[in-house]
């Protein structure tokens, strides 16, 4: 709840979407390294991502792919549902072919010019978290550009729930990671 943040004035707290945050980070990075030919966008919640994933992503971009995502095949059956009002049951409307589904991870890699163009074209969406892209590859897809998939890694999971944190602590061999 944003109202629980201690602030002196309402102007002390400025909330932006994930997409807008990445766009600002991209601008800052390119001011610092204006001749960068490859940009990686990584989710800090994926703190255990093995270096080999980064190597695969960068290698694919440098090998000619304009956008690259690491991903794993989806193991569970996935259902598409009809959205229902809160408290009402959802109804299944379809079952996608699991063999074509991938769980996407980060870092996602891009030719710099492609990512800049994707954020420029998608900038209106960035102002509203409900409309903002959930990842940068989606912005590139919206440009009609191809997105290449490389092998992800199970260790690149997001640490977002208490269960995830417990798993991360176990993997790191600590009780307080």
Residue spans for each PLM region:
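Short phosphate-binding loop-to-helix
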Residues: 11-37
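SAM-dependent methyltransferases
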Residues: 135-137, 154-155, 162-177
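Residue-level signal for inorganic ion chemistry
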Residues: 25, 42-43, 73, 111, ...
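Single conserved hydrophobic/aromatic residue that forms the stacking wall/gate
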Residues: 1-12
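Conserved core of the sugar-phosphate nucleotidyltransferase
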Residues: 48-148, 177
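Conserved active-site beta-strand element of glycosyltransferases/polysaccharide synthases
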Residues: 147-151, 157-160
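Short acidic donor-binding/metal-coordinating loop in glycosyltransferase active sites
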Residues: 14, 42-45, 106
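Glycine/small-residue-rich pyrophosphate-binding loop that anchors the diphosphate of NDP-sugar donors
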Residues: 2, 105-107, 156
């Amino acid at each position: 709840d944003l109202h629980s943040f201690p602030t002196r004035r309402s102007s002390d707290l400025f909330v932006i979407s994930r997409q807008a945050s990445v766009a600002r980070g991209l601008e800052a990075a390119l001011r610092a390294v204006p001749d960068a030919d490859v940009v990686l966008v990584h989710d800090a919640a994926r703190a255990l991502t093995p270096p080999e994933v980064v190597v695969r992503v960068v290698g694919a971009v440098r090998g000619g792919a304009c956008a690259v995502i690491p991903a794993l095949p989806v193991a569970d059956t996935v259902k598409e549902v009809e959205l229902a009002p809160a408290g009402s049951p959802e109804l299944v409307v379809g079952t996608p072919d699991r063999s074509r589904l991938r769980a996407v991870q980060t870092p996602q890699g891009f030719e710099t010019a492609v990512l800049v163009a994707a954020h420029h074209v998608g900038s209106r969406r960035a102002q509203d978290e409900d409309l903002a892209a959930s990842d940068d590859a989606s912005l590139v897809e919206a440009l009609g550009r191809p997105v290449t998939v490389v092998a992800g890694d199970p260790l690149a999971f997001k640490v977002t729930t208490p269960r995830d944190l417990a798993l991360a602590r176990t993997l790191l061999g600590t009780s307080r990671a």
